[in-house]
């Protein structure tokens, strides 16, 4: 490539110290001492010229020529004088730079600028000179205080127009980066090896400079200054005005230096192999790679890997040589059967990976990303066990694992039935597609033979093939697409939501993975981090898919109601919208993977304790199934069937050594636990089992095992569990006016009981006193009941005239026992009204009759909740008859048969109807006697 020569100019000449060569783009320090008066004079002249030519007196605008001393071993044009080198009696070391003449100077040098002057505090200082461009000394015109001469400069071309130079430039870059890498790795060797080292920070800076350099001449000069070379070789490079020749020379020096470093590494028992870059100019030009060089013997050190790292200890290079990791990665990606979008991205990243040096941080990032793509199950699925016995097997599995929970089981069996029918349809469609493809294949072969034998074109064959293709596409469109439901199980803790999801996976024969969402506050935990972040990784969904290795697992999203809200880290609940939307999750995009992933085959089952904290858009995407707390009967069944055998086994006992009766379990449930689930019940059973284990061990160790009684009675519970923690109300044998038995369901869920409503009157001014730690709603129920009784006191026979106030000169006190327990809710309205009527009329309510329901000012009895728990508690307390709102008739149908048989359930819709059932002997008006105007709009 032709160089650009500038006109001749006159500038000061600075002879460089011995064995020193300054190249363009390089900064050099030149010491100014008493032995170099010429430099002081030159610097004074530069300052004077700068002061006269520039406003600020900047000395870096005044050029000088830095010229090295000549060498007797090299000619003026850079040719090595081998033939007469031995005849030279004077060497460059014998020349004093301060007294150098034109004959002592090398013809080539560098035009430079003085970038700074550093003082040392001892009277000496140092010049900082930066090379700018090559120059040729044409003539020395002054040699008084300092040298001055006429020089011509040569500038490198700005554009690369030669293909050969461009290829050499790429080879120079590869070798330069290899050189930096091997210097960095050599720093890990013992210092006694003599191999130069390189800090990680400097290595990264050099690697960045090499990658960003656009000019081959500048990079060649820079690397020539770094690489180890002789004084004469540097002079030769200084004379190479042609960029192509200069780059080739530096490639030669780099190749030699790399070889020397590798040999040094071998001496320190490091088994080396050839790096995957060209090692000589010819190989660099043609892109060839030398074969690996076997290390002598079996080194005990760490062999150097072709990928730029270290391999394991021991063995030689041939034994420890691993397969090319890029090829292995390509095989894994091919085996993963990526989606079209993922395959396109993987191909692009593989090409990038081949161009990235293994020592670069980007190499590890790209490799990790490709490994993640290979580990995601794009098409791998678990075959669902959907045979003729699918529903029976699943029903049996769910019944064995969980007692009750009929609504959940019903929904899951519906899903299995739909899945089974869809699979049958798809199997039939697949057989038709296969048959049609075979027919089209035979027709295609015959058409090819006919076309080879006959010249005319048969248009009928094309029409037939087109019709067959249309039919094939129509058949493929008939395939049923499975969209798994997204279920939300809502219920109190300990009712089996998590274990139910695991049973579903077992019944389906699918893999199961649990994702805990409690406390997740960062959107990136769901969607993953961008690859641009340090230590980025995919989100919980993609990590779960990688772990199970199939595209159709059962994912349990545990505690979805406890996901953090919107913050500076994003909104994780909003990130779940795409995951849990059946219409969108077939194209779920993780920030790290950044490729659409199909989640439509995943069966998501979420759990929550409450719906209050779940955002409405997220709740709308899930099918909510409520799991109420277990009743006492259900707890007893679960304990006898699951918990007792489990705890006996855990504590080293068997059923013959401890006998739990249903009565004992019922007492533990009623008197020692009050919860919706069975976790505390299991703990109490475990405590009893441990106590019996101590008794059995003592009897066995004493040699009198016959003294041990395996039978467990109700009276033994206080010894193992202490005094009873909860007391159950029992229906009284006798009754008195003003006392009514109400029903209550505990807020913990699963338990219910009776609650006495006590009303007393006293002389007063019509005030009402409420006690028993009653809530606001319960207080309002008392006010509504009292208002209705006062309004209908004349019809009830409580006053002599309609205008008489029954509360005149009277005050009442309403109390609910268990005053330390908070009570609230509207369900005691009917009980309050009946209790007030009983007090004012002096008629007692039957003690074995209980009631629940909300009352309105019109006297209507409206529906309440917790019917199942309340009635089970009523039966346990000895109640015989229960008054329920007519609107709760549907809830009574779901009661256990034991409750239906043990209670007389009466449904009432108005307070007058309830009064007639409570006191059937009285003459009471009907609610129809007091018609009301109601809007039907």
UniProtKB/Swiss-Prot annotation:
Transmembrane segments: none annotated. InterPro entries: AAA+_ATPase, ATPase_AAA_core, Lon_bac/euk-typ, Lon_lid, Lon_proteolytic, Lon_Prtase, Lon_prtase_N, Lon_prtase_N_sf. It catalyses: Hydrolysis of proteins in presence of ATP. Pfam families: AAA, Lon_C, Lon_lid, LON_substr_bdg. One of its GO terms (molecular function) is serine-type endopeptidase activity. GO terms for cellular component: peroxisomal matrix. Keywords: ATP-binding, Hydrolase, Nucleotide-binding, Peroxisome, Protease, Serine protease. It is found in: Peroxisome matrix. Its EC number is 3.4.21.53. ATP-dependent serine protease that mediates the selective degradation of misfolded and unassembled polypeptides in the peroxisomal matrix. Necessary for type 2 peroxisome targeting signal (PTS2)-containing protein processing and facilitates peroxisome matrix protein import. Belongs to the peptidase S16 family. This is Lon protease homolog 2, peroxisomal. It comes from Neurospora crassa (strain ATCC 24698 / 74-OR23-1A / CBS 708.71 / DSM 1257 / FGSC 987).
